[in-house]
From Swiss-Prot:
Keywords: DNA-binding, Metal-binding, Nucleus, Receptor, Transcription, Transcription regulation, Zinc, Zinc-finger. GO terms for biological process: adult behavior; animal organ regeneration; axon guidance; cellular respiration; cellular response to catecholamine stimulus; cellular response to corticotropin-releasing hormone stimulus; cellular response to leptin stimulus; common myeloid progenitor cell proliferation. Induction: By PDGF through a CREB-dependent transactivation of the NOR1 promoter. Signal peptide: none annotated. Phosphorylated by PRKDC. Residues 97-113 have a biased composition (Basic residues). Residues 291-366 bind DNA. This is Nuclear receptor subfamily 4 group A member 3. Residues 142-151 have a biased composition (Pro residues). It comes from the Eukaryota. Residues 1-140 are annotated as: Required for DNA-PK heterotrimer. It comes from Rattus norvegicus (Rat).
């Protein structure tokens, strides 16, 4: 036997790694072997590692003493090529012993602390005699108090580079310093082993004053089996038979555990016990979080543009339209669908929808401001810029104004009918009854247009049905005169009615009587005011939405009227109107009501004349609107 040591004597010269020989076949050169190369597999039960080492086998020798167990410096040699492969004898009840005793390993300045054994030394013949390739621990006499357990250090990360340390293996025929990592065998042959290198420092005395184990940590890697990878002793031994090199493992009377690989900064209780912590799931990369929809086309929109949450496409379209002052024409009936798929079909309807949802044209930089990212020119700030903390107070007036303009343009006839237009003396041809019937027909057509127009005013449909009907019937004559005055070319005696019919003044004189001259004068005065379309839209809405006798909820009607007035004031305050329009609109309302009184007088006269019985709807409207 090449190494024999006494129990309490220093190690003989032949037991050190510098003079260790085995026969005459091996040299005594000192080398630094490469540490084990690890092949890691992530499994569902934990982290398994397949280790292949460059030494074929290693062994320690010990002497049997019934009352002492002390680890001596390792004497390692190489097995002859013809010798049998070392096997590993597993402990059959190591899980129970592991749970009953908490063992800690303190690795500091290249030494180990003394531990109390958890199982008495082997006494049976089967447990006492093991192959020469096994490692034994025997209890040392309790000359000094045992050192209390220290918390284990966190295991080195797999990414850390293993430092070089002097080894105690003599190269021989079976040892190749350039040996490559052996590919992993079958899943059953993989052995979960954790290697923790020791820094190349000389041993230091125990910090607690106790004797440390006489085991050189640079001689071999510290081995530890996690509990999660433990299995029956027989199956483990059979699985390890196919390993390229036999790895001796001592009976686990004292366990040196290392925390397994974890993804957290500090080891948890489960990692200290060798259990595999649950791996965190990858973050959920949801593409729809935090995004809204475009108010114009319904596409994805991340932020607001020009006061409204819109997509990049509608933002660019609106900006180009405003900067170029482009004018679009709808080839259909001005109600084309605007969505993600069909938003490029009609530019007119797309731009009108941009305005209706509240996009502000004044926010778009003009040609003189293109490319500037600084401050806008100093001018009176709009309420939108002065009070950004509020939820956008000017938005309701802007939305109301756009809706009123859209309602007025929709009520305008698209095609003019000149089929009955006759400016000569033949215009007076026909009987009086025919002219009166024509007068009634034009009034009836105006009622239908007024009803569809009123339903497009924001907030009107929220009123009670009774109030809606009362407001429309009370203002039908005012709306009739106002639309006729806006569309007609009274300077040439051309009157354009709600259904698109164009008649000369002489063609209408026998049915309208003197009321037609009052309408012509009002039209000339209104057109001389140079009101823009926004002011005309507000004038039309205010002529209907006003205080009337018999309303069920007059407060709500008053609130709606105030919103329309605020829209007109806001339009004037921004300087968009050519001239101050609010006083002109109020004066026009007063004149309009006077003209409507003359219209009621004309209907009353035709009823008395009784040439043609009026339609039921005209008769009812006449009776409901009488001031007495």
């Amino acid at each position: 036997m090449p190494c024999v040591q006494a129990q309490y004597s220093p190690s003989p010269p032949g037991s050190t790694y510098a003079t260790q020989t085995y026969g005459s076949e091996y040299t005594t050169e000192i080398m630094n072997p490469d540490y084990a190369k690890l092949t890691m597999d992530l499994g569902s039960t934990g982290i398994m590692a397949t280790a292949t080492t460059s030494l074929p086998s290693f062994s320690t020798f010990m002497e049997g003493y019934p009352s002492s167990c002390e680890l001596k410096p390792s004497c390692l040699y190489q097995m002859p090529p013809s010798g049998p492969r070392p096997l590993i004898k597993m402990e059959e009840g190591r899980e129970h012993g592991y749970h009953h005793h908490h063992h800690h390993h303190h690795h500091h300045h290249h030494h180990h602390q003394q531990q109390q054994p958890s199982i008495p030394p082997p006494s049976g013949p089967e447990d006492e005699v093991l192959p020469s390739t096994s490692m034994y621990f025997k209890q040392s006499p309790p000359s000094t108090p045992t050192t209390p357990g220290f918390p284990p250090q966190a295991g080195a990360l797999w990414d850390d580079e293993l430092p070089s340390a002097p080894g105690c293996i003599a190269p021989g025929p079976l040892l190749d310093p350039q040996m490559k990592a052996v590919p992993p065998m079958a899943a059953a042959a993989r052995f979960p082993i954790f290697f923790k290198p020791s820094p190349p420092h000389p041993p230091a005395p125990s910090p607690a004053g106790g004797h440390h184990l006489g085991y050189d940590p640079t001689a071999a890697a510290a081995l530890s089996l996690p509990l999660g990878a433990a299995a029956a002793a027989g199956s483990q031994a059979a699985a390890l038979e196919g390993h390229p090199y036999g790895l001796p493992l001592a009976k686990r009377t004292a366990t040196l555990t290392f925390p397994p690989l974890g993804l957290t900064a500090s080891p948890t209780a489960s990692s200290l016990l060798g259990e595999s912590p649950s791996l965190p799931s990858p973050p959920n990369r949801s593409s729809s979080s935090g995004e809204g929809t475009c108010a114009v086309c319904g596409d994805n929109a991340a932020c607001q543009h020009y006061g409204v949450r819109t997509c990049e496409g509608c933002k660019g379209f609106f900006k180009r339209t405003v900067q170029k002052n482009a004018k679009y024409v709808c080839l259909a009936n001005k109600n084309c669908p605007v969505d993600k798929r069909r938003r490029n079909r009609c530019q007119y309807c797309r731009f009108q929808k941009c305005l209706s949802v509240g996009m502000v044209k004044e926010v778009v930089r003009t040609d003189s401001l293109k490319g500037r990212r600084g401050r806008l020119p100093s001018k009176p700030k709009s309420p939108l810029q002065q009070e950004p903390s509020q939820p956008s107070p000017p938005s309701p007036p802007i939305c109301m104004m756009n809706a009123l303009v859209r309602a007025l343009t929709d009520a305008t006839p698209r095609d003019l009918d000149y089929s009955r237009y006759c400016p000569t003396d033949q215009a007076t041809a026909g009987t009086d009854a025919e002219h009166v019937q024509q007068f009634y027909n034009l009034l009836t057509a105006s009622i239908d247009v007024s009803r569809s127009w009123a339903e497009k005013i924001p907030g009107f449909t929220d009123l009670p049905k009774e109030d809606q009907t009362l407001l429309i019937e009370s203002a039908f004559l005012e709306l009739f005169v106002l639309r006729l005055s806006i569309r007609s070319n009274t300077a040439e005696d051309k009157f354009v009615f709600c259904n698109g019919l164009v008649l000369h003044r002489l063609q209408c004189l026998r049915g309208f009587g003197e009321w037609l001259d009052s309408i012509k004068d009002f039209s000339l005065n209104l057109q001389s005011l140079n009101l823009d379309i926004q002011a005309l839209a507000c004038l039309s809405a205010l002529s209907m939405i006003t205080e009337r006798h018999g309303l069920k909820e007059p407060k709500r009607v008053e609130e709606l009227c105030n919103k329309i007035t605020s829209s007109l004031k806001d339009h004037q305050r921004k300087g968009q109107a050519l001239e101050p329009s609010e006083p002109k609109v109020l004066r026009a309302l007063v004149e309009l009501r006077k003209i409507c009184t003359q219209g009621l007088q004309r209907i009353f006269y035709l009823k008395l004349e009784d040439l043609v019985s009026p339609p039921s709807v005209i008769d009812k409207l006449f009776l409901d609107t009488l001031p007495f």
